[in-house]
Amino acid sequence: MRAFGKLLDAGNSIILIEHNLDVIRACDWLIELGPEGGDAGGTLVAYGPPEQVRLGSSHTAVALREYEQALGLDVPVLQAAERAATYQVQVDDAALAPHIGPDHSAEEGASLQALIKARRDKRRELAAKAPGHSAIEVVNAHENNLKGMSVNIPRGKFNVITGVSGSGKSTLAF
């Protein structure tokens, strides 16, 4: 996750096909394809920040809620990200330290979840101010089993594409 943070801090965009729920919870923007695989896939099922997607009824939404419940987190993703992790990391970017909160300074280290949240908040703030093309636009994608899908993938963000096997994730990404 720290490597992703460094790439994003350098101005890169990340588009990742992923099923790991910790990674999904940490992303800025989530795109779920489905609803199933093969001929029953290839459509846009859900998209948005993970804290918004988790409120739906898709496979990923249900999995996120069940995972958070199993972890004992009965609060939305962003609030859960503020909870302290069981280990500490050093903040390598002094500009992010004020966004982490009063209990976590760069000198004493910050929880990984707090660092992820601070970086996500900073990226969202910068993207809101950025002029020009803020998204990679995919229009009427119909390769393999994609069914005329149009989607915007935010630039400079940590984007995750997820969905069941055969739903069109790799086709969309490539």
Please provide the spans of the model-predicted regions.
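Conserved phosphate-binding elements of NTP-dependent enzyme cores
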Residues: 1-174
